[in-house]
Amino acid sequence: MQQSTPYLSFRGIGKTFPGVKALTDISFDCYAGQVHALMGENGAGKSTLLKILSGNYAPTTGSVVINGQEMSFSDTTAALNAGVAIIYQELHLVPEMTVAENIYLGQLPHKGGIVNRSLLNYEAGLQLKHLGMDIDPDTPLKYLAIGQWQMVEIAKALARNAKIIAFDEPTSSLSAREIGNLFRVIRELRKEGRVILYVSHRMEEIFALSDAITVFKDGRYVKTFTDMQQVDHDALVQAMVGRDIGDIYGWQPRSYGEERLRLDAVKALGVRTPISLAVRSGEIVGLFGLVGAGRSELMKGLFGGTQITAGQVYIDQQPIDIRKPSHAIAAGMMLCPEARKAEGIIPVHSVRDNINISARRKHVLGGCVINNSWEENNADQHIRSLNIKTPGAEQLIMNLSGGNQQKAILGRWLSEEMKVILLDEPTRGIDVGAKHEIYNVIYALAAQGVAVLFASSDLPEVLGVADRIVVMREGEIAGELLHEQADERQALSLAMPKVSQAVA
């Protein structure tokens, strides 16, 4: 039952940056003992609101009210001391320090300037036990798995008696087992009467955890759902994108041309058995498989990121020798990698540079001078055509949302003479509206005759977008399914390891 008095309230919150209005008049309430989800497309304002709550940003207008008192935090330390903790996607811990030191960093127990190690490890052990974690507090953090790092971050919040704990995309790097453990902890924190804010694009997580959902769009409050029995996927999507998008995938049958890409008994590092497949001009082929199936390893090998150890790659019936990415690009084969931030973009460069970096060599003046006129026009053209949301072409790409970063990478390859595009988890961590836009780009590329090979662990996405689905299992092809005939049961049956099938 919802309490009558909210523990946390946002009142008319607005935030303006130079040239950008990030938040406008955000007002809603959160209650103790509830998980309150925040949803919206990338750039909707969720992370900005959390940064205001945590003291990273000061609001331009409005106020934050905690337990009836209007609060203003000068920095994150002030917020943490007031009982507000944010568990970010990129964890703020020190790998070289011990678990206990990370938990009590800034408030280490000491006497006469000397840290009381015995008391430190004892207190840290109590916090870890509270979370059900069997970890030696004296262990250096660097030796723990990422899921355990997250538990240390939560223990750090509890050590400061945090009453408000916000999670920002917490499961993006976790295994299924680690996600289950995180959910167990969040439910325990809810039982203890804490306010839990939860930001995620994964609707299955939202429905599994939430007592209330607030939706943002374009920096504005849209709606708060409080009756979880009456809200469904379609209602959330409509609130997030401002329209009923119906079938988000929008697949339609199309005709294909001649064979454009062929793999003849190709092996790459991490791919156990030779892979043979073909993709025709204008065809979209989806690669599906469970973790460890070899999808990403095959993609990296085809692009020259890792070594092809056997077999032959053909483009337009011509054998291609790919030993590094420049060989693939020269042959007309491009890659949007799974690790978008680490391998797909240059974070400290502008959107303009990230779009132009590959094709600029073809447009230099006198063989050595950058053609600024071409670069400006090319970047602006792709920003407009791909609907990249940015204050301008000179904005650092690291400041863009994941969906807009992905569209900038696509813009880079649209600047080249593309025959084949390899897409590895192209919509991971991207909101539903941006996914729809990226699917439309994929369809447009296919309509232009590009052969599309994309790998995804999102089975509904593969079934919804691909003309043909190639299922991989333990580094080999387990089977193929046509779009019109494929369903989740068939695909999962093919993808499951043989041992599991035998046990079943």
Swiss-Prot record:
<keyword id="KW-0067">ATP-binding</keyword>
<dbReference type="InterPro" id="IPR017871">
    <property type="entry name" value="ABC_transporter-like_CS"/>
</dbReference>
<dbReference type="GO" id="GO:0005886">
    <property type="term" value="C:plasma membrane"/>
</dbReference>
<dbReference type="InterPro" id="IPR027417">
    <property type="entry name" value="P-loop_NTPase"/>
</dbReference>
<comment type="subunit">
    <text>The complex is composed of two ATP-binding proteins (AraG), two transmembrane proteins (AraH) and a solute-binding protein (AraF).</text>
</comment>
<keyword id="KW-0813">Transport</keyword>
<dbReference type="InterPro" id="IPR003593">
    <property type="entry name" value="AAA+_ATPase"/>
</dbReference>
<keyword id="KW-1003">Cell membrane</keyword>
<dbReference type="Pfam" id="PF00005">
    <property type="entry name" value="ABC_tran"/>
</dbReference>
<comment type="similarity">
    <text>Belongs to the ABC transporter superfamily. Arabinose importer (TC 3.A.1.2.2) family.</text>
</comment>
<dbReference type="GO" id="GO:0005524">
    <property type="term" value="F:ATP binding"/>
</dbReference>
<dbReference type="InterPro" id="IPR003439">
    <property type="entry name" value="ABC_transporter-like_ATP-bd"/>
</dbReference>
<dbReference type="GO" id="GO:0015612">
    <property type="term" value="F:ABC-type L-arabinose transporter activity"/>
</dbReference>
<keyword id="KW-0547">Nucleotide-binding</keyword>
<comment type="function">
    <text>Part of the ABC transporter complex AraFGH involved in arabinose import. Responsible for energy coupling to the transport system.</text>
</comment>
<feature type="domain" description="ABC transporter 1">
    <location>
        <begin position="8"/>
        <end position="243"/>
    </location>
</feature>
<feature type="domain" description="ABC transporter 2">
    <location>
        <begin position="256"/>
        <end position="499"/>
    </location>
</feature>
<dbReference type="InterPro" id="IPR050107">
    <property type="entry name" value="ABC_carbohydrate_import_ATPase"/>
</dbReference>
<feature type="binding site">
    <location>
        <begin position="40"/>
        <end position="47"/>
    </location>
    <ligand>
        <name>ATP</name>
    </ligand>
</feature>
<keyword id="KW-0677">Repeat</keyword>
<keyword id="KW-0762">Sugar transport</keyword>
<keyword id="KW-0472">Membrane</keyword>
<keyword id="KW-1278">Translocase</keyword>
<keyword id="KW-0997">Cell inner membrane</keyword>
<dbReference type="GO" id="GO:0016887">
    <property type="term" value="F:ATP hydrolysis activity"/>
</dbReference>
<protein>
    <recommendedName>
        <fullName>Arabinose import ATP-binding protein AraG</fullName>
        <ecNumber>7.5.2.12</ecNumber>
    </recommendedName>
</protein>
